[in-house]
Amino acid sequence: MKKIIIKFLFILVCVPALIFSQQQRLMYEKLIEKKGIMYSTGKKPYTGRVFDNYRMKGRKLTGEFRNGKKHGNWTYWKENGKTDREESYFEGNKNGNWVYYNDNGIKERVEKYEKGKDT
């Protein structure tokens, strides 16, 4: 019984680690747009995380695509390292709060969207 519990705990810990380590991460500039859908290589729309950096100055953006469309939370930074804006998408449509920041990184305004429409 003790061996079964140990094996179960081992599987419980290792399987999620393997699954999450397989998630793709790609530089945004490597993607190709065709008719509003993003592709990395091949014929299948890209699914996975993307990022981009300013040349020698840190992060520019992070986000995620699902089936070639923006999905989930996206964050953009200014060259000075301060947050520029935060966006949220669901299957390519604007969804949730979009937060904009000024040059000092202070929240300037919030726009709310649901299924691509301003609310």
What are these model-derived regions, one by one?
Residues L18-T119:
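Glycine/tyrosine- and acidic-biased, solvent-exposed loop/turn segments at the edges of beta-strands
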